[in-house]
Amino acid sequence: MRSVSYVQRVALDFSGSLFPHAICLGDVDNDALNELVVGDTSGKLSVYKNDDSRPWLTCMCQGMLTCVGVGDVCNKGKNLVVAVSAEGWLHLFDLTPTKALDASGHHETLGEEQRPVFKQHIPANTKVMLISDIDGDGCYELVVGYTDRVVRAFRWEELAEGPEHLAGQLVSLKKWMLEGQVDSLSVTPGPLGVPELVVSQPGCAYAVLLCTWNKDTGSPPASEEATGDSRETPAARDVVLHQTSGRIHNKNVSTHLIGNIRQGHNPEGGNAGLFALCTLDGTLKLMQEADKLLWSVQVDHQLFALEKLDVTGNGLEEVVACAWDGQTYIIDHNRTVVRFQVDENIRAFCAGQYACKEGRNSPCLVYVTFNQKIYVYWEVQLERMESTNLLKLLEAEPEYHRLLQELRVDPEDLPAVCTLLHQTLYHPDQPLQCTPSSFQDPT
């Protein structure tokens, strides 16, 4: 395991307290460049743009914000910001700029706060949220996990046609009851390529939640209130629990999950997607399909957040896990591990694409600390994940062998090659002393 150091960092001002899932990266203003969204326990929603330490804009919500997200939740072809409070208030914000900006790029609101374009009450005690197509119909659904081991799915339903104004509501599609606490929600392709909704379960386990409403005789009526539980009948058969292989020391340990890990062009992988799990006691696993364990890694840190990020630019997403003390692990599909240390304790973490500088998105690691700062490490890239040395790199260069022949050095004579490289790097002004006998003139 090798250590890396990232130095390109910006510090953002943040003075509030937040829940672990009240932070995300996404394109909030539909300009193809991602922003950072953070919600705090006072109900304040802050959006950071580029490398400015101050929020680009702020919004006020009702209640303590527990989870935020960015996506086309209304299926109108435009991203909205979704903020949900512990009290069950769901807010939708359309942050596409319509007002003039000042010289620094901040909104000239003159004290006017950004207000939600839609607000609805859903069941309280929210914990985690997901915006994704979970049933394969091409439309996005909103999935919310709760502290009482319940997961609910919602879908936006229009009440009137109107592209400029949101005239509709979120209707409840289904309610699932889990055996353990839900710490993560994700979607990953199943064996047939159809999306599967997966949730984490304690003890490095996970459950697949079946979306059966498409098989029913009809869709939920628009008049059905999302807050009502009278017509929600959670069925045990719609929850398929999976215990991952291997020995688990603590069956109740908190577990996090991330799905749909991009594996590039891999004909051998078929349609099945990759997903990863991590636990608070330091276990990391990469899975393919339901019960195919690709690798398992044990570290000596408490892992509380799990993300995916392509740090090598080869189309394969690495698994990124963060511990409370700032230790961050980056692991590729071949179980190669790289670690990065942030010298502060961390209260929340996320990773993804963020337009920090140069007017383009780049891989970023985002850490929320306890000292009123958010650190964004941008341009997080590695040339390769695996460890290597100078000789291995030179061996891949055709020019290397030609130059050795000109210098009359045998490429197979490792001591002579090392001596030549040492002298070239550290004593270039001295004459070359390396002339192996195999290349000497016998006369």
From Swiss-Prot:
UniProt xrefs under InterPro entries: Integrin_alpha_N, KICSTOR_ITFG2
A GO cellular component annotation in the UniProt record: nucleoplasm
One annotated GO biological process: cellular response to glucose starvation
Phosphoserine: residues bearing it: 104, 219
Superkingdom of this protein's organism: Eukaryota
TM ranges: none
Name of the gene: Itfg2
Keywords of this entry: Lysosome, Membrane, Phosphoprotein, Repeat
Oligomeric and partner information: Part of the KICSTOR complex composed of KPTN, ITFG2, KICS2 and SZT2. SZT2 probably serves as a link between the other three proteins in the KICSTOR complex and may mediate the direct interaction with the GATOR complex via GATOR1. The KICSTOR complex interacts directly with the GATOR1 complex and most probably indirectly with the GATOR2 complex in an amino acid-independent manner.
Lineage of the organism: Eukaryota, Metazoa, Chordata, Craniata, Vertebrata
Ranges of the FG-GAP repeats in the UniProt entry: 19-48, 125-154
Pfam families for this protein: Itfg2
Compartments (UniProt record): Lysosome membrane
Function description: As part of the KICSTOR complex functions in the amino acid-sensing branch of the TORC1 signaling pathway. Recruits, in an amino acid-independent manner, the GATOR1 complex to the lysosomal membranes and allows its interaction with GATOR2 and the RAG GTPases. Functions upstream of the RAG GTPases and is required to negatively regulate mTORC1 signaling in absence of amino acids. In absence of the KICSTOR complex mTORC1 is constitutively localized to the lysosome and activated. The KICSTOR complex is also probably involved in the regulation of mTORC1 by glucose.
UniProt name for this protein: KICSTOR complex protein ITFG2
Keyword Membrane: yes
Coiled coil ranges: none
UniProt keyword annotation of Membrane present: yes
Main location: membrane
